[in-house]
Regions:
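Short, glycine/charge-rich beta-strand/loop segments that flank catalytic centers
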Residues: 40-45, 78-87, 120-122
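Short, flexible loop/turn elements at secondary-structure junctions
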Residues: 15-20, 44, 68, 85-90, ...
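Local sequence-structure signature of Cys/Sec-based thiol-disulfide redox active-site neighborhoods
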Residues: 2-50
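Domain-scale activation on soluble regions of proteins
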Residues: 8-9, 51, 56, 148, ...
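Structural micro-motif
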Residues: 53, 57-87
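GST-like fold's C-terminal all-alpha helical module
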Residues: 76-80, 94-98, 104-111, 115-222
């Protein structure tokens, strides 16, 4: 329910370089040219501690966990990225820590840039749900499956969803998943597929088919 038009406080977006869910928020940030309204701060993953850390202390905090504790006195939040927030009366005001919601919030901001922005349009919610559950989450379900049955189910759903996208692209007249207009479907799918060969194929065992077998998806990804 946050109204960006009525609130003039500087909005901040915390993201991690390696996080695909952060990547989708950064895509909207760039496409909408929101650098005047939203300040992006990148955090690094500390392998030793398993935490996200600031390159320089931010508001007295070195880690994301410390920042969450400082800003969620009345609410319980998991220390995850991305994170959209501002300050009210010098207090941290968390707007959202859910990437899909952040994408929608940022897309609602009117850019102050003089340059032309690219609009992100809505798409079929069932398609978006398929991308989110079976592809974005699906690669992790494959990689972290606790048994063979769970892995096979996740892999089957993953490649079934990719086949659905492949067929949809084959019927399209435009360059995007839903035709001639960029939609949330493109924003959601790209961060996963751009990481496919480097991460998901081998490390997460997403090997039922090669991504190169999906000719239309490869063309779309370019």
């Amino acid at each position: 329910n946050y109204d960006f038009k009525r609130n003039t406080e500087k909005t901040y977006l915390l993201v991690g370089n390696s996080c695909p869910w952060c990547h989708r928020t950064l895509l909207v940030y760039k496409l909408k040219k929101l650098s005047r309204q939203v300040k992006v701060i990148f955090l690094e993953a500390d392998i030793n501690s398993g935490q996200w850390v600031f390159n320089e202390k931010f508001k007295g905090c070195k880690t994301l966990n410390q920042f969450y504790k400082k800003g969620s006195q009345n609410n319980v939040f998991r220390s995850t990225l991305p994170l959209l927030f501002n300050f009210q009366n010098d207090q941290i005001n968390i707007l959202s820590s859910e990437s899909s919601q952040i994408v929608g919030l940022m897309d609602s901001i009117k850019s102050e840039s003089s340059q032309k922005t690219l609009e992100v349009n809505n798409c079929d919610q069932d398609l978006l749900k398929t991308i989110q559950i079976d592809i974005n989450d699906g690669v992790y379900k494959c990689g972290f499956a606790r048994n063979q049955s769970s892995y096979e189910k996740a892999s089957k759903n993953l490649f079934k969803a990719l086949s659905k996208i492949e067929k949809k692209l084959d019927k399209n007249l435009g360059n995007w998943i839903c035709g001639e207009e960029l939609t949330y479907a493109d924003i959601y799918l790209f961060p996963t597929l751009i990481r496919w060969e480097l991460i998901y194929r081998n490390l997460f065992k997403c090997t039922e088919k090669e991504i190169s077998d999906f000719k239309n998806i490869i063309k779309w990804r370019l």
